[in-house]
């Protein structure tokens, strides 16, 4: 269907169509408002948009987000994770998964074939996304969607003087309140993969599967 204020065609069943004009050379104060970092920003001069018309389908759904909370972060992390996965795979083909659990942070799971691939994965992430500041790389036997397992790998498979890489004076996000006034930031990566090989770290201490099968929670719960 045709717009209300122009000849532009838009989907007839769109949830909502907002027709507006961007006013050239005009600025006004915007804010304060929250950001994905979890901090609130003050006022800033921003462009002005004048809304000319709003139309919507019957029973339209308008989706809003709670700024800096999970629904806000999820919108951006999905495409970021896909981009980082491609970047790591070009350097470490045996990458298993990538997760962005928090602002400026990335977890990577790899099946390490040769020494040094953990560090290669770190550099791939930091080089692929300006916003990335902290990278943790673990072996494929560690679930990167479980923060407790990631911290366990850091505690038991990482020696700080050997396995932490720090890059100074790199460009980062201006939304990071810890960034230096000149816009530079330090970035760091943690190689929490097993060294010299995963074989030296197995078997992991786990309750045998046959024991779990013999346990019936009904015997212990009222």
Regions found by a protein language model. Give the residues of each.
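Charged, compositionally biased interaction regions
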Residues: 1-222
